[in-house]
Amino acid sequence: MANLNQPPSRVTPNLLHILNAFTDSSNSIVNTIVELNSNTINKYELITETGHLKLDRVGYSSLAYPFAYGCIPRTWDEDGDPLDIEIVGVTEPLIPGSIVEARIIGVMKFDDGGEVDDKVIAVLADDKRMDHISSFKDLGEHWLKETTYYLSLIHI
C-alpha cells in the first residue's frame, strides 16, 4: 500500500522566488508566470508558498477574461500577493504555468474593497505586432472601457 503524507523525495524550485522580475529593465521587460489565458472563465491562482497553480474559482457566467493574466516573480503588492499582470493582445493561447517575457506598457490602479490591487498592463515582449504600443492608452478607448468594466464585475 502507498504511504500517504510523506515528505517529497525531490523538491521542485518555486519559480516565483528564483526568477528575476526584470529580464531587461531598460526596456521594461519582465518575466511573467502565466496563471490563466484570455477567453477562459475559470480563475487560477499561483500558490505563493509552492509555486503551483490552483483552481481558485469556477466561472459561472459567460463573461470570459479579455486578457491573459499572471504575476511577476519576486514582487509583492500591498495586498500581500505578487504583482498582477495583464497581457493584452495575445492571439495564441499561453500555457498556464509557463513563463513569458512581457513588456510593461502601464499600470492601472484598483481598489478591491479597501485593499490596493494594482494591475500591471503589458504586451508580449517579442510580439512584433505590438511594437508600436508604448502605453495602454495606445490600445484605444474601447479597450480601456472593456477592461475597466470587466474588472469592476470580476474581482481578480
Please state what every model-predicted region is.
Residues 68-69, 79, 84-90, 94-95:
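Compact, glycine-rich, soluble single-domain proteins
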Residues 36, 74, 90:
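Residues immediately flanking
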Residues 114-150:
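Well-ordered alpha/beta subsegment
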Residues 95, 99-126:
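A structural-propensity feature for long, helix-poor, extended segments
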Residues 2-53:
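N- or domain-start disorder-to-order transition segments that initiate the globular core
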Residues 53-81:
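Short, well-structured hydrophobic secondary-structure segments
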Residues 28-31, 66-68, 82-84, 117-120:
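Short, surface-exposed beta-edge/turn micro-motifs
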Residues 154-156:
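Conserved small/polar residues in nucleotide/adenosyl-binding loops
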